[in-house]
Amino acid sequence: LHKAIRRQRQMCIRDRNIAFMLICSALVFLMTPGLAMFYGGLVRKKNVVNTMMTSIFIIGTGIVMWVLFGYSLSFAPSSNGIIGDLSWIGLEGVSLTEGYKDSAAIPNMVFCGFQMMFAIITPALITGAVAGRMKFKSLFVFIILWSLIVYYPLAHMVWADGGLLGLDGIGALDFAGGDVVHISSGVSALVLCIILGKRHDYEHANYRIHNIPTVVLGASLLMFGWFGFNAGSALEANGLSAHAFMTTAVSAAAAILSWMLCDVIKNKKPTLIGASTGMVAGLVGITPGAGFVPIWAAVIIGLTTSPVCYLMISFGKKKFGFDDALDAFSCHGTGGIWGGLLTGVFSSTAINADAGNGLIYGEFAQFGAQALGIVITLVIAVAGTLICYGLTRIITGKIRVSKRDEMLGLDITQHGESAYPSFNGLDN
């Protein structure tokens, strides 16, 4: 009788974890439409359709690719710790009952669904850097290639059993995607925008954000989904997921306040766009360490990530001369690097036994692993993006739109649609 009761209790706990993870998966999915709104509100109205489309189409390519071969390449067994084999192609052999790992609290298929949402949002982040000047067909091909060449190998190296960069490798900590999601996409965005070159009227035109309420709504949806992003990375409903939930909220809140302070110092007034961007920066900063650092450390991470990203946006872009249109690198790349390093400063075995103690506890090894993991991620992202660009040029030809199309706007020239058809004339 006691064995039957124990078995029933275990089944209830497993069912609870499955429900929790499916909800978190749905929350992470919501981040992609949220990103479409966030980016769409930031551009001029002649590029709204194109900008939002560059996020939405990835829902299609991302899911189909993930089911066919993406999950297998990312998480199937491997002998090299770099890329999975094809044993799970088409999700063949992905169990509905057995866990991904021996100790997993959820079935392999549930884990697959959760990770699928990460594979959608990550390449979508890149598109903000090239808004308004890249041909849609070229971006379509580039994103497919980037997922294959950069994302799937990185996901395997950091999160899969035996991965080169993760706990079975050099020991770099990445709870929910500092390396895999934000640094990879942010650095790739930087490389791609440098290759494309600046917009034709860059530094000469006054780029007006066309819809601030849409930006705020998009940022809010991103934060809402981010709770599933970070808390769900605990992979079960337990104290660690609650801890990740709280560090996520605290870092975002602190980052909002510090960005507002930066606005006041520089421009004498706080801005709604600034507060929204600060929210996203704080979320990026806490992502690698959400399940590894104390809650008080999340305050420090949020407070410092905003100024670092703010400096890159306000001074770094001009100093280094790159046109990161919607600050994909400045927020995600810069914030991801900063957050990854601070994870090596504040990580604590008292929070998560998988983590080593950070610099603040007098130990250097974890910080060194974080720095090495970031450097390797940078190399993979840069090299992979250059390869993807070269292949895209071969497949589609010139990837940048003509000056005429850029001036007219990509909504009409690439899609034959207008976000606001009742308005006449061009956006200046």
Protein language model features and the residues they cover:
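Single conserved hydrophobic/aromatic residue that forms the stacking wall/gate
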Residues: 1-9, 13
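Glycine- and aromatic-enriched membrane alpha-helices
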Residues: 10, 14-428
